[in-house]
Amino acid sequence: MPDVRPEVLFVCVHNAGRSQMAAALLSRLGGDAVVVRSAGTAPADTINPAVVAAMAEIGIDLASSGATPKKLTDDAVRASDVVVTMGCGDECPFYPGKRYEDWQLDDPAGRGIDAVRPIRDEIERRIRGLLAELGVSAVTP
């Protein structure tokens, strides 16, 4: 039987902040009901330390989860049902028939944890809305 879980791809420029937080939050809240990926158009070497710290505050351990910035590929876009972009503009590939959303969010690059927390919280709010739109019940962490 084919896998009918929705596949969601989060894309930002460096795949070191917003898209990493979104992927981790969707994985946590969507559980096994969704397939989650993240990527960047120009990936950084490491995830932003303030992002790692902000996620640790809510019990998500990016440091030991194996999460690393990854390069956006055409295959990742083709495999996804929903592509959520976060500040990559025209650098993100477009394929007809895919559902695209562009989330306007502040970039946490170079910012401290106090600036990252509200970005994290806004991403979580949007993730909960996306789950509802996909017909997936959020898992209680």
PLM regions with names:
Residues 1-141:
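Short polar/charged helix/loop
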